[in-house]
């Protein structure tokens, strides 16, 4: 993303609105603009304690041009009715940004005293390059800041345990790690010509064979410590069973759509460009993109090296260029499991989240329901939290702003993005309770 080509005025307007809507937060905190991202520091009573960070991102994905009329309410109107808050970013993730500020504003208005320093970090470009969170992370690292834990966006759903073969009950994810990210760009060159003489193969053929060769690479598959903790939490295995049967568990996970990305590096061809203009015309230069999500233990350099090796021999030798695309990131290091941040999330979630179909109208769990299980896991996407891994042993990706079934089906980046007012308020209640633990 070309930062100079971005219109930053909407971000300036958003920050001005934040200061107007949540004045106590910005009066009490030290406010810093880092690049176009925001860092607010609310000093605690005991400076010896490591700070906690609550974070989110201010940017949103675009609305597909031409679909604006398909929205029930204008996509950037922020329309609120009796049931829903509508608009792009209602779920991803203005709800968490606004909810954090609302919770802190409420706490300050009610005389909140906190031992630990609280950092609020709001990035500018999570949906693209993550430069904003990266800039904040570097500033904090240069200052020698070490966090106790942080909470970033996570899975927005409460899911049935049966989805994982775990019997009855309901679950929420607390993702403690994320996979690495790498885009591999393949390029082939050709003079083209008439399709009646494809001597040596067309550039499309060469590129296709290169894609297949790379997709056929076998990557190591294993049970990470975090996956082992997840399987134990789900009740699928005991710790002793995992230690004795890791190979069998890997095979089971590789056969499961839900679990296979958690045991190995994945490879997905996503883009191809440069076909010819006619059915009887051979294409000239072409390129393709293959997206990798790396399991802990496989580095960006490993991916580049193995892809180059896959196309280095035979008829492909010298005919395919392999480049690393922008925006790569290494997998999370092995995280702290069962730390104070996760325990706080577990304890508070047990008070505020139960069976989503049986919650009382005031947002509290219905009497007699079992609490939601909080499952430590790995997120297979990418988040801003990765930019803080060097200064934080417990990066928790967890959302207290739960979407309803319709929103799950539609997708958070789709038309008519929305969150219920009740879910938004429940997320704020969760955060207020979390603030009381600092």
Regions found by a protein language model. Give the residues of each.
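Flexible glycine/proline-enriched surface loops and loop-helix/loop-strand junctions
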Residues: 166-170, 187-194
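A short core secondary-structure module
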Residues: 134-139, 191, 196-221
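Short pre-catalytic strand/loop immediately N-terminal to key active-site residues, enriched for Gly-Thr
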Residues: 81-92, 372-375, 415
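Acidic/histidine-rich catalytic neighborhood of metal-dependent amide-processing enzymes
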Residues: 84-87, 91-173
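Acidic/His- and Gly-rich active-site-bordering loop/insert found
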Residues: 1-90, 97, 107-116
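Short, solvent-exposed loop/turn segments at the edges of secondary structure
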Residues: 73, 115, 145-146, 167-169, ...
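Hydrophobic beta-strand positions in extracellular immunoglobulin-like domains
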Residues: 42, 188, 292-294
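An extended, acidic, His-containing surface patch that forms the Zn2+-binding/catalytic region
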Residues: 31, 39-41, 47, 158-160, ...
């Amino acid at each position: 993303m070309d930062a100079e080509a971005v219109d930053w005025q909407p971000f300036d307007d958003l920050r001005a609105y934040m200061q107007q809507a949540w004045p106590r937060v910005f009066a009490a905190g030290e406010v810093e603009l880092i690049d176009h991202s925001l860092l607010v520091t609310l000093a605690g009573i005991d400076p010896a304690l490591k700070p906690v960070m609550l974070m989110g991102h201010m940017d949103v994905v675009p609305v597909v041009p031409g679909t604006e009329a398909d929205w029930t309410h204008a996509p950037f109107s922020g329309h609120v009715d009796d049931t829903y808050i509508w608009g792009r970013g209602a779920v991803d993730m203005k709800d968490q940004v606004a909810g954090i500020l609302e919770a802190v504003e409420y706490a300050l208005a009610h005389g909140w005293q906190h031992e630990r320093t609280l950092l609020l970090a709001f990035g500018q470009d999570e949906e693209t390059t993550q430069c904003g969170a990266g800039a904040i992370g570097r500033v904090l690292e240069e200052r020698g800041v070490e966090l106790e834990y942080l909470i970033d966006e996570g899975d927005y759903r409460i899911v049935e345990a049966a989805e994982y073969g775990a019997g009855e009950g309901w679950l929420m994810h607390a993702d403690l790690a994320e996979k690495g990210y790498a885009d591999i760009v393949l390029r082939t060159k050709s003079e083209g010509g008439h399709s009646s003489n494809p001597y040596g193969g067309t550039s499309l053929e060469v590129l296709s064979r290169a894609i297949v060769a790379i997709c056929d690479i076998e990557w190591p598959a294993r049970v990470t410590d975090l996956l082992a903790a997840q399987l134990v939490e789900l009740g699928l295995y005991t710790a002793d069973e995992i230690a004795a049967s890791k190979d069998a568990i890997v095979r089971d996970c590789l056969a499961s759509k839900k679990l296979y990305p958690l045991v190995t590096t994945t490879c997905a061809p996503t883009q191809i460009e440069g076909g010819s203009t006619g059915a009887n015309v051979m294409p000239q230069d072409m390129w393709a993109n293959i997206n990798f999500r790396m399991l802990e233990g496989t580095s960006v350099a490993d991916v580049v090296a193995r892809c180059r090796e896959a196309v280095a021999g035979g008829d492909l030798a010298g005919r395919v260029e392999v480049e690393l695309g922008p925006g790569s990131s290494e997998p999370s290091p092995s995280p702290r499991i069962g730390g104070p941040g996760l325990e706080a999330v577990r304890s508070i979630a047990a008070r505020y989240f139960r069976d989503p179909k049986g919650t009382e109208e005031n947002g509290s769990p219905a009497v007699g329901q079992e609490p939601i299980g909080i499952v430590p896991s790995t997120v297979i996407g990418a988040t801003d939290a990765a930019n803080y891994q060097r200064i934080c042993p417990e990066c928790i990706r967890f959302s207290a702003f739960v979407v309803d079934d319709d929103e799950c089906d539609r997708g958070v980046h789709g038309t008519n993005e929305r969150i219920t007012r009740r879910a938004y308020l429940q997320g704020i209640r969760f955060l207020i309770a979390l603030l009381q633990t600092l």
